[in-house]
């Protein structure tokens, strides 16, 4: 067991969840100077860029169970390492959500039941999109995210630019899908806040595991076929 890789994944996912969800909970609607949808999108993207440069050489900087599964499906990551990576990612997201909850609770009028950056469908979708619309959005967005990750980290891709391409992709994904699902494409990121919201957020959490995992696997398989990469697994392959 390589505990350093798992610790890096936990820390990286903590940062993604704390910075990304924190921007939504604390800064998005701040009177007069709130960062809004664009600011939240940038926060998620920048969290990935910064962590990719910080821990990409340690764990590959997956920060996301769908990325880990997608890389395995694409032949870039050993299947036997999926479970410990996912556990580390979920733990990091939960700790981030707990810290964010403590901080946000210090503001008067804070109500965790209003969403706490949770993902949802139907009445709990920001735009009240249907379950099917939200499911398709998460599948397609995660599929394209993995496609970009696979391409940006390919051996023939320009060296050193993968974190930027991947971070910008996540910004684009959020710009499009925040109104639909509040943007997941990451089961760990969805799990942390949902645990504190409870109720509807936990009841709808299944979609934000199933759809991203399907999308991630599809993205990995499609890029593997398209690029005609070797079928052998490369241990420790990087996501960013």
Curated annotation (Swiss-Prot):
Residues under site feature: Involved in tetramerization or stability of the tetramer: 21
GO MF term (any one): water channel activity
UniProt-annotated site: Selectivity filter, residues: 44, 174, 183, 189
Highest taxon, organism lineage: Bacteria
GO CC field: plasma membrane
Keyword NAD: no
Principal subcellular localization: membrane
InterPro entries: Aquaporin-like, Aquaporin_transptr, Aquaporin_Z, MIP, MIP_CS
Subcellular location: Cell inner membrane
Protein name, as recorded: Aquaporin Z
Taxonomic source organism: Bradyrhizobium diazoefficiens (strain JCM 10833 / BCRC 13528 / IAM 13628 / NBRC 14792 / USDA 110)
């Amino acid at each position: 067991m390589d505990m350093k890789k798992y610790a890096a994944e936990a820390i990286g996912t903590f940062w993604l969840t704390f910075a990304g969800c924190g921007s939504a909970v604390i800064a998005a609607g701040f009177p007069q100077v709130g960062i809004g949808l664009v600011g939240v999108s940038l926060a998620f993207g920048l969290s990935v860029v910064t962590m990719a440069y910080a821990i990409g050489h340690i764990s590959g900087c997956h920060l996301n169970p769908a990325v880990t599964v997608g890389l395995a499906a694409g032949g870039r990551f050993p299947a036997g390492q999926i479970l410990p990576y996912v556990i580390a990612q979920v733990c990091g997201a939960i700790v981030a959500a707990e810290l964010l909850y403590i901080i946000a609770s210090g503001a008067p009028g804070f109500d965790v039941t209003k969403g706490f950056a949770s993902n949802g469908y139907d009445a709990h979708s920001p735009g009240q999109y249907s379950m099917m619309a939200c499911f398709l959005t998460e599948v397609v967005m995660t599929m394209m995210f993995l496609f970009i990750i696979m391409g940006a980290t390919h051996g023939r891709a320009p060296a050193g630019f993968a974190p930027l391409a991947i971070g910008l992709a996540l910004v684009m994904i959020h710009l499009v899908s925040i109104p639909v699902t509040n943007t997941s494409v990451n089961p760990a990121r969805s799990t942390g806040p949902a645990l504190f919201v409870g109720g509807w957020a936990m009841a709808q959490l299944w979609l934000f595991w199933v759809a991203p995992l399907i999308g991630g696997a599809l993205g990995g398989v499609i890029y593997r076929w398209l690029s005609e990469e070797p079928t052998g697994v490369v241990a420790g392959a990087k996501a960013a």
